[in-house]
Amino acid sequence: MPLDPSPTLNSLGFAKPPAETRVVVAMSGGVDSSVVAAMLAEEGYDVVGVTLQLYDHGAALAKKGACCAGLDIHDARRVSEKMGFPHYVLDYENIFKDAVIDEFAESYLGGATPVPCIRCNERVKFKDLLETAKDLDADCMATGHYIQRKSGPYGAELHSAADANRDQSYFLFSTTPEQLAFLRFPLGHLPSKEDTRALAEKYGLSVANKPDSQDICFVPDGDYASVIRKLRPEAAAPGDIVDTDGRVLARHDGVVNYTIGQRRGLGIGGLATPLYVIKLDAEARQVVVGPKSMLSTRTVPVREINWLGDEPFQSRDAWHLAVKVRSTRPPTDAIIRPISDTEATVELTSPEEGISPGQACVFYDTDSSRIYGGGWIHKG
């Protein structure tokens, strides 16, 4: 008797009907996650929407371009009511403050330029929320991120989004293989954000024309300095602006007001050569400035590496990959030399300016859209 053919997989990769496949959708209240939830509900999946209350407890009701607070929660609930699936709001404010906001402030005090969105994905959404999804007996968790999950010979692989302008791989490099096995990203293959909004119109969602979220969600109007001053008043302590020889050039009103690579607003005039911020020394309360040439570097120390390759990270003396050292910059060719399973020296083929501790260094394949993980840039 011939063997039965392999069972047909549904669109989420499970060998059972959508109605028997439970998927928790992480809903921020924006158009992306709303479309994911509506799309899966339309396909007949057993959808459960979950929104995290991360901050403000409603104080941001009227804030535009935020997520996970105030009106966004109501928007997510309206989508669930329209599409007919349950929706839950979980209070994660304390977890979010401890895991993301406090570290954001501490990192800045330490002279780094942190990326809190990565820590939020790593420590809140893809950790605690993912465990909540499992507690709800979900088969998987779906999000509205623009990134792709593809099946490879050794398991699920992380790939850049089809729309390079919307690609969020820089913010998701720390996704572990175990998390990736459970996650789904239904929007990653779409050619453009216009396609997402067209789907929102198709499903009749009220968020179809809602603006995209901007900046850091817990920072009003992009004024991160005010948030840090509130959390850590010592960040506003005045100090000296000095050159690389320690010569005092001016005074400043808190290192929190400066970033690596900054030129304007230093209060230094009359010099033949323009000066840029090249280092922040929060402990000494010093802003160190120097010529633009000192912003360039080819060697980047990276730690806390999350490796997503098929071979062990230390199986080679060097990996020839492309890396991103800022979310807004394209990948550049580099040689990655492992020091341990979680630490490496990255040698850039071409020097980059303004590389700052606290930023991520994300690894990409040079011949495909695959992401090989990444790590955090540390002080040399």
Curated annotation (Swiss-Prot):
Cellular component, GO annotation: cytoplasm
Reactions the enzyme catalyzes: S-sulfanyl-L-cysteinyl-[protein] + uridine(34) in tRNA + AH2 + ATP = 2-thiouridine(34) in tRNA + L-cysteinyl-[protein] + A + AMP + diphosphate + H(+)
Q: What compartments host this protein?
A: Cytoplasm
What are the residue positions of the site described as Interaction with tRNA? 145, 359
Q: Which Gene3D superfamilies does the annotation name?
A: Adenine nucleotide alpha hydrolases-like domains, HUPs, Translation factors
Question: Which residues participate in ATP binding?
Answer: 26-33, 52, 144
Family membership: Belongs to the MnmA/TRMU family.
Enzyme class comes to transferase
Keyword Nucleotide-binding recorded: yes
Write out the ranges of the annotated region (Interaction with tRNA): 166-168
Q: What is this protein called?
A: tRNA-specific 2-thiouridylase MnmA
Which terms does the record give in the GO molecular function aspect? ATP binding; tRNA binding; tRNA-uridine 2-sulfurtransferase activity
One Pfam family it belongs to:
tRNA_Me_trans_M
Q: Which InterPro entries match?
A: MnmA-like (IPR004506), MnmA-like_C (IPR046885), MnmA-like_central (IPR046884), MnmA-like_central_sf (IPR023382), Rossmann-like_a/b/a_fold (IPR014729)
Q: Which organism is it from?
A: Roseobacter denitrificans (strain ATCC 33942 / OCh 114) (Erythrobacter sp. (strain OCh 114))
What is this protein's function? Answer: Catalyzes the 2-thiolation of uridine at the wobble position (U34) of tRNA, leading to the formation of s(2)U34.
Q: List S-S links within the chain.
A: 120-217
| EC numbers, comma separated | 2.8.1.13
Alphabetical UniProt keywords? ATP-binding, Cytoplasm, Disulfide bond, Nucleotide-binding, RNA-binding, Transferase, tRNA processing, tRNA-binding
Any one GO BP annotation for this protein = tRNA wobble position uridine thiolation
> What domain of life is recorded for the organism?
Bacteria
Active-site residue list: 120, 217
